[in-house]
């Protein structure tokens, strides 16, 4: 963890983190929808996880493209 990282590498890592967070958010949202009728508790947990990844996406979007997603 003591590696020196240049700005381009940091930007690449943040883009990879955003792509991963987007994939996870979609996965948990889909799981929430699948479990809605059969497992309400599991559906709730999946919804919470989906919201957590959505928050990560918002933060990374603001870091990577400041002011673009103002809502």
Regions flagged by a language model, labelled:
Residues 1-23:
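Short, charge/polar-rich alpha-helical segments
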Residues 23, 27-70:
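Short, charge-rich amphipathic interface segments used for partner binding and complex assembly
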């Amino acid at each position: 963890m003591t590696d020196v990282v240049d700005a381009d590498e940091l930007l690449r890592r943040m883009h990879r983190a955003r792509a991963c967070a987007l994939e996870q958010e979609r996965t948990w949202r889909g799981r929430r929808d699948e479990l809605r009728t059969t497992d309400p508790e599991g559906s709730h947990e999946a919804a919470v996880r989906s919201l957590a990844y959505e928050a990560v996406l918002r933060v990374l979007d603001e870091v990577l493209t400041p002011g673009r997603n103002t809502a």
